[in-house]
């Protein structure tokens, strides 16, 4: 039998353990059925379940400032009432956050209500998800349908997005435009693993950042796997990017690097590896340094350097009216490239390529 003294000692030890517990251990699991309740109660929860939430018009599902270690689960169908505004529909920040989707869940943006074929012009359309300051965190297994405009805006360090499905296929016939899947900027350490995307703009667009890995992606119907446009922003450096083991089909481009005319910056340590393309309407591989006001001018400048670029096992076919490969560099600004097993066929050969390293073919 335990003595009173030993029981007292045990109780004091337990109290000390509780007193020293981290905040997340003291918090509980919460289920929210409204966006307002989630915003008001998020700080007191170690696990947040978002249960069939209908987000009011013009309102962000605000999960910013989450306590470190919080788990977020999307359950049922998440919907958003209609208003013409900039968004985002969802915003999340914090450290060591784990975001998942429960079995059978759907985040249905019903973007057709906004689509008018004009993208960032025309009706004001909300962006979908801001992962700004969502550091050392993960987003896994989300099923997303019909974003009004861009899907994920990533500005975070050490973030991993895995098994994300973005199905904007309806936008092909209903006026979806500028529905980028993953826009990455001002980030260090971004991993995007096994995404499935059907959209009407870039599957991946990296405007700035370092240590970025995109692997095992399926990209359908958009503008391909892009770096840029680089230049003209507060951060104009893209470094150490690997894009690999992915397919790009029925898209405008497959592999693309573009920089802004007259700007400064750098693109370096870039690898595209094991990329398979089909049904490409514009360019299989395009690297150009002539963008101005969002459009190519045909007049490249050399203020943004593109160095240490490796293309290996980049293969597939483009449409007969498309161009296999187009390389337009400024004087001396493209260097130290490696090309190995780059085989793009089916389209035209460009006669306008300029200033590209001799190891490449155009």
UniProtKB/Swiss-Prot annotation:
Q: Where are the PbH1 repeats?
A: 156-186, 238-259, 267-289, 301-322
Query: What Gene Ontology terms for biological process does this UniProt record contain?
Result: cell wall organization; pectin catabolic process
Q: Which domain of life is it from?
A: Eukaryota
Q: Where is the active site?
A: 201, 223
GO CC term (a single one) = extracellular region
Its EC top class is hydrolase
Gene Ontology molecular-function annotations: polygalacturonase activity
- Pfam families named in the record: Glyco_hydro_28
The UniProt record lists the EC number as 3.2.1.15
Transmembrane feature ranges: none
Give me the residues of the propeptide, which is removed upon maturation.
Answer: 22-27
Question: In terms of one coarse class, where is the protein primarily found?
Answer: secreted
The signal sequence is: 1-21
Location comes to: Secreted
Reaction catalysed? (1,4-alpha-D-galacturonosyl)n+m + H2O = (1,4-alpha-D-galacturonosyl)n + (1,4-alpha-D-galacturonosyl)m
- According to the UniProt record, which cysteines are disulfide-bonded? 30-45, 203-219, 329-334, 353-362
Which residues bear sugar attachments?
240
This protein's UniProt keywords: Cell wall biogenesis/degradation, Disulfide bond, Glycoprotein, Glycosidase, Hydrolase, Repeat, Secreted, Signal, Zymogen
Family statement? Belongs to the glycosyl hydrolase 28 family.
Q: What does this protein do?
A: Involved in maceration and soft-rotting of plant tissue. Hydrolyzes the 1,4-alpha glycosidic bonds of de-esterified pectate in the smooth region of the plant cell wall.
This protein's name: Endopolygalacturonase II
Gene encoding it? pgaII
